Amino acid sequence: MAGLNSLEAVKRKIQALQQQADEAEDRAQGLQRELDGERERREKAEGDVAALNRRIQLVEEELDRAQERLATALQKLEEAEKAADESERGMKVIENRAMKDEEKMEIQEMQLKEAKHIAEEADRKYEEVARKLVILEGELERAEERAEVSELKCGDLEEELKNVTNNLKSLEAASEKYSEKEDKYEEEIKLLSDKLKEAETRAEFAERTVAKLEKTIDDLEEKLAQAKEENVGLHQTLDQTLDELNCI
């Protein structure tokens, strides 16, 4: 009778362990479903999420191996019904393994929470980068508008330079006395043209360069006006001399 009672106790413990194993399996399946639901978000997260997936997969494999060991232990317990003491020791081993499985499942739950946190952090970083991109696009658009205004001013200055150059060239035949001044003016105009071309490729300094060029052009136009006045005076002197010669 004592042996039968021991066997009955063993069977009850086996049934209790089987129930614990079923519950562990249900919990594992529930965790697996949650993990499947999070996979799509984890794929979009950073590289740590991929590493975390590998760790979760290892945990799942360990859980499968633990379930196989539990099934083996249950089979050994069924074969050990004639040896109650041996069965008792086997049950203790199974209890220890079941506790380890529960600890592993708790670890798996913590890893799942960590994966969710990483995915949320990745989403937050993406939104922050998107906001910065919108700000940079606005600044770029304003910079392009300033560059267009500078290019228009440069075009106007080029036209003015062409006009000044044409006026200077028209005075080349007026008098040999002013050829040296005209060469100097042409050299200055060429220098200004080179500076103007350089200003077109450096939009950020265009406004200051345009201001300097405008002042220089005003100075050149003033010098040109003086040259014209001197040329008129020269012609008047020549005409007066010719009149005096004719009178003689």
Curated annotation (Swiss-Prot):
Cysteine pairs bridged by disulfides in the record: none
Compositional bias ranges of the Basic and acidic residues kind: 33-47
GO CC terms in record: actin cytoskeleton; actin filament; cytoplasm
Residues modified to N-acetylalanine: A2
GO terms, biological process: actin filament organization; muscle contraction
UniProt family annotation: Belongs to the tropomyosin family.
The name this protein goes by in its record: Tropomyosin alpha-4 chain
Organism: Equus caballus (Horse)
